[in-house]
């Protein structure tokens, strides 16, 4: 075996994209052991902590090859049966002349033993371990087409109240209206904190976003279900085979409307926001809205989401909150106005 080739992989896209890149790095080494030394230059460095496949490399090392990582496979996602996880892998194969194959249907994230064995952030707040689901009831302003109406998220929470604790998360500078009856951690978690929350969570409820990718990438806790429950309110923007994971309940409407009759529409916003972003352009705007939100999301009613959660609860014999846990949690739940901004 010759001297390993040194690679620094570059990408500064969103954390969800970078979770896909972690899979590509893993499978580069799984398929070509000892052939490469790899390092990365990306945003969201917390995603790479404890990663066993990285070796610190200097960018000015003349032996290092810098590779800007992309996923052009997305351009044919409506025509090809490929998942987002294949995107960076396909690009590395084309760029490096390799035949990397996906070895696991998920990203590759690594918590420390201390992060896994310690009490969850929720347990630290409540004073005892409580089963909980993460809920993401909003999203980024550049992709408002992914938003589901906040009253529908609230209806799901209300249905499960007293049985399931929902922990609401979301970044401070994104749109995440406050929900009532949840443990409110919006704007209060680092990316690493979020990874720990997902690890300890019983399930995840979200739109198409980072959190569904974390749900698939994070290992599951010993003694729990073999896969982490995740319900995704997806609509019609992306073809389901590009985003969905086999063990998730991915509620989509592709094929139900003229605008997504043959695949995802791939549009960005439901209405223009006037912020100067190119996504205000007509070619990026939803063509079928209901009260300024996309019809493809409007078609998904709370009862459909509730049904998926209930199926997980029964199928995996997931435990509900006990009376004692409910009493301990109650004073910590959010009772502010539902449209309150993130502090």
Each language-model region and where it sits:
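Catalytic machinery of carbohydrate-active enzymes
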Residues: 1-343
């Amino acid at each position: 075996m010759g001297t390993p080739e040194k690679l620094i992989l570059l990408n500064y896209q969103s954390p969800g994209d970078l979770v896909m890149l972690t899979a590509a790095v893993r499978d580069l080494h799984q398929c070509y052991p000892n052939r490469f030394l790899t390092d990365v230059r990306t945003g969201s460095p917390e995603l790479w902590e404890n990663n066993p496949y990285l070796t610190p490399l200097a960018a000015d090392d003349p032996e290092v090859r810098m590779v800007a990582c992309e996923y052009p496979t997305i351009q044919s996602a409506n025509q090809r049966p490929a998942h987002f996880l294949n995107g960076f892998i396909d690009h590395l194969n084309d760029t490096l002349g390799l035949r990397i194959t996906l070895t696991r249907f998920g990203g590759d994230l690594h918590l420390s033993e201390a992060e896994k064995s310690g009490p969850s952030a929720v347990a630290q707040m409540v004073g005892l371990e409580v089963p909980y689901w993460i809920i993401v009831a909003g999203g980024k302003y550049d992709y408002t087409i992914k938003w589901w109406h906040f009253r529908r998220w609230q209806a799901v929470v209300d249905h499960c109240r007293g049985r399931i604790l929902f922990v609401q998360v979301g970044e401070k500078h994104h749109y995440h209206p406050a929900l009532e009856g949840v443990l409110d951690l919006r704007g209060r978690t680092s990316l690493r904190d979020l990874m720990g929350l997902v690890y300890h969570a019983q399930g995840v409820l979200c739109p198409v976003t980072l959190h569904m990718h974390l749900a698939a990438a994070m290992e599951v806790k010993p003694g729990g279900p073999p896969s982490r429950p995740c319900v995704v309110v997806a609509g019609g923007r992306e073809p389901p085979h590009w985003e969905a994971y086999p063990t998730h309940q991915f509620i989509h409407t592709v094929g139900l409307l003229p605008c997504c009759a043959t695949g995802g529409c791939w549009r960005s916003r439901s209405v223009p926001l006037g912020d100067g972003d190119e996504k205000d352009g007509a070619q990026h705007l939803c063509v079928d809205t209901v009260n300024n939100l996309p019809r493809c999301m409007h078609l998904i009613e709370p009862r459909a989401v509730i049904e998926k959660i209930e199926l997980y609860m029964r199928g995996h014999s997931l435990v509900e909150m006990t009376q004692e846990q409910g009493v301990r949690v109650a004073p910590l739940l959010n009772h502010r106005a539902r449209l309150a901004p993130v502090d």
